Amino acid sequence: ARALAPLNELMQGSKAMQQHVLISGASGLIGSALSTHLAGLGFAIHRLERDNSAARFNYSSASKHVSLDHSIFLSAVINLAGPSIADGRWTASRKQELLESRVDITTALATALAAAPKPPALFLSASAVGFYGESTLPLSEEAPAGGGYLASLATRWEAATGPARRAGIATAHLRFGVVLSTKGGVLGKLM
């Protein structure tokens, strides 16, 4: 909720003009629920398509490039792209896929936003609570990165937002833990 506060501020600050939000990973568990919620609040939602050159907002996995429709001013961009970390065994190739799928699209998106003639005010990018590694101590969001695979993945994923941050776009990392939902994810596996 705290990370979405800037979106609420955007909405409150401009009732006269509809705010446009781009979401990567909009078809995923979190992205689909967030899209519905934000649309209900009055935001115009745009999806970052994958490998669809006809789309207004497209990510080419071959060239690792994001194309943006600059005729639409985006107030915010929310990056939720990447396959579920809970699906499948963590083989060496799966770990590489999880890393590349997150870092590549985040880098491409942050680079495209930084180069936009009128960049968004806000870039929210998914990350993972695994950033902190394993610890029995209470941690705050100011705690440094821990050790291990998830911490390394999250650190590199967050670093990929650098081009947007350096361009002056307010950037926040959403360090998700286990997502529980009756619509998918790990909950069904636990029941």
Regions found by a protein language model. Name each.
Residues 24, 48, 80, 123-129, ...:
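SDR active-site strand-loop-helix element
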Residues 58-106:
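NAD(P)H-binding glycine-rich loop region in Rossmannoid oxidoreductase-like domains
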Residues 99-103, 143-158, 180:
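Short-chain dehydrogenase/reductase
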Residues 183-191:
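Anionic-ligand binding region
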